[in-house]
């Protein structure tokens, strides 16, 4: 990525380094940290120190878009300091942040510019541009419009837990998480990561919890749920702020609909939405979690990071246990713990083939 052009100079240009805990004034920073988590397991053959990672990421620091550049991404200090480190190590957890900038050019504006360029061509040559030439005119229109386009920025938090060899990306979509993971693996040679899989299907477990009315140990079922039928039309039933321990929910599941989202609370401290793809969304730290934490500016970042990751790490561990335990691809599944939720016999195969699919999606040999 080349140096930025056509943007405010000096300190104003560095305001992209939003704090890792960007937050509204009414909330403590840590309370809005990590709204979503996609979980990965780090490859066994990769290791690095904080200093080595920081040095590697420095070669891919964020630089804002140039005049005709549509998109830019790079690493920024998670603390929000203009010239701070790119890796923060707190309580054994490593925090990073990727900044993504995208120039926004509305499609209608592009079309209007293409039409204007096409009219010029027709006037000069006496013929209308063909399909191939219109594509070239579209590229030209974008180059003309990009210097005037508004730039949107999104900061994506990354959490490395080296002792557990886990990686978590705060992304609301798999595509954004893939983009972050690609940037991370490009910056850190030898790093590999694969999505965390569990021995039991999240959908099957959520269905069992709803039908039985029994949440797994340490969790409670909240008031939001989405049920979807697997047939071609994929009819969907959604419950929002609604009691879920009702016959109607159980009837939908018995009729074949599968839970794709379910709101849960862990230990009365962290609420979240679990998806059938093992994504953790809409994370919220509940009252009392940050009570007593330092409010001093110099200490707040460390305190909030330690508390937030200290809550989420055991919550993730309990969640994976509730789903039958983590299943490392290529290894035989461990026996489900005694406290694992019951399930229908067809929902989990007796053995899991060594494939690149999650255990619940693998086709038996």
Please annotate each region the language model reported.
Residues 12-32:
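Short, Lys/Arg-enriched N-terminal segments with co-localized hydrophobic residues
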Residues 10-12, 354:
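Intrinsically disordered, low-complexity regulatory regions of eukaryotic regulatory proteins
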Residues 31-365:
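Intrinsically disordered, low-complexity, charge-rich terminal extensions
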């Amino acid at each position: 990525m080349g140096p930025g052009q056509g943007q405010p100079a000096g300190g104003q240009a560095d305001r992209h380094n939003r704090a890792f805990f960007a937050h509204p004034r009414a909330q403590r920073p840590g309370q809005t940290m990590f709204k979503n988590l996609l979980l990965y397991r780090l490859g066994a053959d990769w290791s690095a120190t904080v200093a080595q990672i920081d040095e590697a990421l420095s070669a891919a620091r964020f630089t804002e878009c140039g005049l005709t550049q549509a998109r830019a991404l790079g690493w920024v200090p998670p603390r929000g300091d203009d010239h701070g480190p790119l890796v923060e190590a707190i309580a054994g957890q490593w925090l990073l942040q990727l900044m993504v900038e995208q120039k926004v050019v509305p499609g209608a504006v592009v079309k209007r510019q293409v039409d204007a360029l096409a009219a010029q061509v027709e006037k000069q040559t006496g013929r209308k541009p063909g399909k191939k030439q219109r594509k070239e005119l579209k590229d030209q229109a974008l180059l003309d419009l990009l210097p005037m386009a508004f730039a949107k920025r999104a900061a994506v938090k990354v959490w490395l837990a080296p002792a557990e060899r886990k990686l978590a990306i705060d992304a609301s979509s798999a595509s954004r998480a893939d983009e972050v993971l690609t940037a991370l693996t490009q910056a850190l040679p030898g790093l590999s990561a694969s999505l965390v899989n569990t021995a039991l299907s999240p959908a099957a477990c959520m269905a069992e919890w709803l039908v039985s009315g029994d949440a797994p140990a340490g969790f409670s079922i909240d008031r939001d749920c989405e049920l979807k039928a697997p047939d071609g039309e994929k009819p969907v039933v959604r419950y929002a702020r609604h009691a879920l321990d009702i016959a109607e929910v159980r009837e939908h599941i018995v009729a074949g609909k599968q839970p794709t989202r379910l709101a849960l609370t862990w230990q009365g401290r962290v609420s979240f939405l679990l998806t059938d793809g093992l994504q953790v969304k809409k994370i919220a730290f509940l009252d009392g979690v940050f009570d007593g934490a330092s409010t001093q500016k110099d200490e707040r970042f460390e305190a909030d990071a330690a508390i937030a990751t200290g809550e989420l790490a055991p919550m993730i561990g309990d969640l994976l246990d509730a789903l039958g335990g983590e299943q490392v691809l290529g290894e035989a599944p461990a026996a489900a713990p005694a406290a694992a939720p019951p399930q229908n016999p067809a929902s989990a195969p007796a053995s899991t083939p060594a494939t690149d699919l999650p255990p619940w999606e693998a086709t038996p040999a």
